[in-house]
């Protein structure tokens, strides 16, 4: 999955960018308080993308 597509999905679920790390961007779901890093790679493996989406859902 492309990184920009994953970020679009995460932001459409109501998550916000918390901070820019050295190699990852951290997104948080404000309703649950869960934070999850998203790596800065053009391509993100499908299994990792599914895990990130699962963790940041409501």
Regions from the language model: what does each represent?
Residues 1-20, 28-58:
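Basic nucleic-acid-binding interfaces
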């Amino acid at each position: 999955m492309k990184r920009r597509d994953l970020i679009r999905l995460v932001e459409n679920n109501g998550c916000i960018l918390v901070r820019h790390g050295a190699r990852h961007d951290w997104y948080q779901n404000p309703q649950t308080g869960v934070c999850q890093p998203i790596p800065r790679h053009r391509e993100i493996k499908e299994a990792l993308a599914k895990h990130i989406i699962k963790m940041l859902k409501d």
